[in-house]
Every structure is written in structure tokens, then in C-alpha cells.
Amino acid sequence: MEDEPKLPTDDGPTFNESCKISSEILTAGDRKLLKVELLKEETTLVSWKKLMDEASKENGGLFVSAPERLLNANPNLEFRLAPGAQTENEMVNQPHPNRLNSVIAKIERLYMGKDGSDGEELDGAPDDDDYDTEDSFIDDAELDEYFEVDNSPIKHDGFFVNRGKLERIEPSATSNQQQPKKRRRKESAKPCGDVVDVSRKRAKMAKTAGGKDQSASPGPSSKKISNDSKTVQDSFSPLKAQNGNDSLVLENVKHTDKANHQPMNATSPKSKAAGSSGPLHPKCSSKSVHEQSNSPPGKSRPNVSAKSAVVRQQVNNGMPDLDIATESKTSIQISKKSGSNGRPKYSTLEKAIRNLEKLVAESRPPAATENQDADISSQAVKRGLPGDVKLHLAKVARIAYASQGEISGELINRLMGIVGHLIQIRSLKRNLKIMIDSIVTANREKDTRFQRIKSEITEMLKTQVPLVESQETNQEAGTSDDFQDVGSLGKSPVKKFVMDVALEEKLCDLYDVFVEGMDEHSGSQIRKLYSDLAQLWPNSLVDNHEIRRAICREKERRRALEGNIGKEMDQTKITKKKQTQLVPKSEGITYPDKTSGVEVKASVVLTATTTSLVDCQPAADSSFERSKQQHEKLKRTSSLSNPAAEGKKVRRKTEPALEETHLPAEKPLVLALKRQTHLKSKTHKQVQVHPQSKAHKQAQVHPKAKTQTPPDLNLPS
């Protein structure tokens, strides 16, 4: 009766091999025992029910299994459960009446496959006892905890009997810090809301339903599971189509979003089925964003958040939601730097979007950030975009159009999350279309200017290059003598093309047109421009470095010219200021009123002194002219001996001459009036200081008059 056990393969024992392990029945009075041979150096897996079935078949039905004994003990219960005639196989496959066994069997099948519980619990179970995953009233928290797998090692080893929860070895401090991070990443990768959780459970149930035995009786549950799997596939099929057709058609901007005008309570049947999960979306989204910000920046995020954003967008009937914009940020793949520091290397578009977000956050008042959700969902009239925000938005549109060729829907959702409190989505699309149209026209004008200047350069080279080549041939013919330098043997003559100023100006203009509107860090494109321009010269007369040096020389000339123009403008401003200062006032000179007697005396003396001053003025002028002529003669003699000093003097003379040319023609008249008023004020001061001493006044007026000599006391009387 006893058979030899079948040894398993190298892959380890399976559940199919456990049923083939032989057993031996031992009887001791009323007790019946099963003897099983254990495999050497391998784990023996035993199914109690299958061993009982084999023993009963081998003994001719003398050994009855436990379920049969229970059913035969209560015939009334048996009649209620199955009023018809039942065969022996149906009695053997009758499930346990406990409902939790069906749930446990399903969970085991998810992890252990088709033979998880050896097919001994739920081969013909009624469908009404299945776990209803679509019921929103049932709390799935414990079920989710059951799905979590703890990979920590067990404390005890070997064969042991345990009661209660298994004791596990606590990980070290370092692994304890790393394990919650991994769990947080898994939780952040999970989509927010019960709608996607239910679809995940549906997919798992559909997977287990596909692995069941096809011989089982098809009931309503199999149809329901197959329908659920179809609905899950249909729910994810628009995601693929939307990822393919996610671009914005800029020509049809005038279409209006009808979903924006619908009320918030008008939801689809899917949203009614998951109505309890709606208020949890903002909290979950903020939690996921916080967890993703704590994760290291070098690792890429999974694309599950993008799918959840699209599912939630279908639930809200196209309403622009802040959660979509915040979660779409996490779906962007960030490439990691190849260096050892591990800092993320952002693209130019990502940098422009971050700068726009930073600018909007700085310009936004703090009160508006608290009511951000209300501002996004409200359909009130919103303010326009500020000037600096519009400039940054145009930069984002230009970079996106240059790199992608269009503005994608994902980018519009992200921009709406940044500037949604300032502008509506229709206005944003219209502004982006206007910006792109202006960019296209500017690029066309830039291309036409670039080609025109390039054609002018080629025309100039057609006339200059043959002249240079002819000069080189003449020089080679003139230097071809019988004697040749030893050091020049084996060296090819160096050809050098000398550019003139006009050609350098054209090259600089071409460079300015090429660089116009270009972003930073564009050194590779500029080097490519140098190489393309160098190819215009035949026989490699000019290389990239000479092109760059020619452009730099022209830039230096332009900067020097701008500096000279600025100096000339400053000089003209100074001369104009001097002219305004030299213009006299029309009002006469007024003196303070003191006593009337002093005024009379001053007027009398003033008339006498003015006449004397007018008389002596020509004599003083003639003496001044003579001294000036003598001084000029001395300077001429010294300049003949020192020509460098003469050059300096000529430059100094030209500057005042230029200033005098700018002065008006009435300058001599103004100077004469100024000299006369100066003399009047001087004589008036002299009269006030010494009013009594008339001899002293005459001495001041006539300084060359002879003073009276005192009498000599030594002379005889």
C-alpha cells in the first residue's frame, strides 16, 4: 500500500508534488493516523485534505473526511443546502460555510497563483459569498494592510510552532531610515482617490479569474469579473489615445470649453460611484507633492500620476483643477547629471517654467495664495497678465515651440496651474497663439536678413579673393631664386587673407542677426556659425579663429565710436550750459537803501570817477597789448627750439577756438556790458569805503601820480 515518494526537481517542491507524496494509515483503537515520509534536505509540503481523499479512496471509503462527517451528521442542513441528489465528487468539493475562507482564498491566489490553496475551498462557491470590491461602504484599510509585504527576517529558524503574530528581527538604524522612504515612494506612486484603487482591485480580481480552472461552473460572478476587466481596460484606453493626441491645435483657438460653464454638481456616473472620494483629492495631492519633494531629485518619477490626473479630469468633466497642474509637474522626467555631485540637469524649457513660477509667486499677494482653489474654480472676470509675466510666458512659448514644434496640452495644464489666478484657459490659449505667430514672423524676417547679409559677403569675397591669390602668385614668382633658406625647406607658404573694415562690418552684422533672440549657453551654435562662414573662403584661407577675431575687432571699433559720441554729447551739453550762464539779466543793478545823504555824495563822486576811468582805460589797454605781443614773441622763439611743445600749444588753441565758434555773434557786446557793470560796482565800493579823504581817492584813481615829498630838515633855514 505504501508507495515511494517522488522527489522534487532542483527548483524546489511545488503544490502539485505535495499531493503525490505517499501516506500510510495507522490505526490504534478508534484513532486513525496518517504516516508521511519527509523528503531529505528539502521542505515537504503536505495538503491535509488531499491526503485524506487519497486515504479514503485507497481504503474503499472506510476513512471518511471531516467535511463528509459533518454533513452526514446533520441531514436537515444537507437537505437545505442541496435539495437534489449529489454525487460523491460534489460532496467532496463542497466549500466551508465560513465567508472569510473565500476572501482568504482569493488573497492567496493573488500571491501564490492557481494552486495557492490547492483548490480545496472555492471550486464551486456561490457567487453571492464573494467579496464585493465595488461596495464603497466597505472599508478596505485592513485589506490594504494585508497586501503589504514585510521582508524583514523572522526571529526563529527551523521547525517551530507559533501562536499569534510572527516575531521578526528589527532592522538596523540605517535600514530603518531607508525603509520608510521606499514605502513613501510607493504610496506617492499610488493614484489619489478610491476610483483608481477600485480599478486596481478589479484588475487583480480579473487576473485571478483568468487563472481559474475552466471546468468550474460559470456563474454570474465570472461574468461580472470579465465585465469589470473590460471596464478597466476601457477606462485606461483613453489614456493611451490622449498621450498620443495631447497637442494643442493653435488654429482652432476660438472653441469654448462647455465644461467650464457647467455646474460643479453635474457629474458623470463614474463620479457618482466614487462620490465619497471626491473631497479627499486635494489632501492626497498635497500629500503626494510633499512626499515627492522629500525624495531625491535625481530619480525619475513614475508616470502613474499623469494617468490619475487624466482620470480625475474625466471625473470633473473637464473642469480645470489645481491638482492636475501640481501632479503633472511630477510626471516630467528629470535627467541626472553624469558628474559625481548628482545634481539634476534641467532643460532650458524647465528652467524657463521655473523662472515663470518664481516670478508669479513673488508678484502674487499672500492673501491670494490662501484662496487658490477658489480662484481657480471661480468663473469670475480675472485680471490680465502683468508685463513681466507676459514676457516670461512668451519665452516659455518660444522655447517650447522651438524644441517641440507645438504647445502640448500637458504644458498648457501646467501653465494654467501657475497663472490660473490671473487668466482663464481660453485667454491663455489665445495669448499663446498670438505669441507663436509673432515668433514665426520674427523668425522669417531674421532668416531673410541673414540670407541677404550672407549673399553680400559672398559677393565681396568674389572680388577680393582673386586679387589676394594673384598677389600671392606674384610674390612666389619674385622670390623663386636659386638661393633658398635652409629653414624654409619642407614648409608650405602660409596663405593669409587680410580682411578690410567693410567685410568685418558685414561679418559683425551677420553675427548680430544670428545671435538675436538666442538663449544662453549657445556656444555650440556660434561655433558652428564660425565654421560655416570659414567655408565661404576657398582653399582654407580663413579659419574659425580669424572669423571670431574679425568680429571682435569690429565690436571694439563700435564700442570706441559709441564712447566718442558720448563724449561729444557731454561736451555740447557743457558748452550750452556756459552759454546760458553768460547771458546777462535785463534788470539793472540795485543797491541797498541807506541814508539819503550818502546816496547824494556817492552819486556826485561816481560821476567824477567814471569819467576819469573812461579816460584812463585806453592807456591801460595799450600797455596790456604791448606786454601780450612781447609774450607771444618769446613763445615763438621757444617753440622753434621745441617742436613738441608747439604741437601741444596748437591742440590747446584749437579747443578754445571750437568753443568760440559755438558762441553767438553778440558775445563781444555781452563782454563789454559785463566789463562796464564790473567797473561801476568797483568804483561804488571805493566811494563807500573812503568818503572823506579826497586825496586818497585821487591816489586810487591816478596811481601813477607823484606823491608830495616831505621837507628836508637838514637844510639851512
UniProtKB/Swiss-Prot annotation:
Keywords: Chromatin regulator, Nucleus. A motif (Nuclear localization signal) lies at residues 634-641. Residues 118-136 have a biased composition (Acidic residues). Residues 623-632, 653-665 have a biased composition (Basic and acidic residues). The keyword Cell division does not apply. Residues 214-246, 285-308, 706-717 have a biased composition (Polar residues). Disruption phenotype: No visible phenotype. Residues 114-136, 166-308, 620-717 are annotated as: Disordered. Pfam families: HUN. It is found in: Nucleus; Nucleus, Nucleolus. Component of the HIRA complex made of UBN1, UBN2, ASF1A, CABIN1 and HIRA. Interacts with HIRA. This is Ubinuclein-2. The lineage of its organism: Eukaryota, Viridiplantae, Streptophyta, Embryophyta, Tracheophyta.
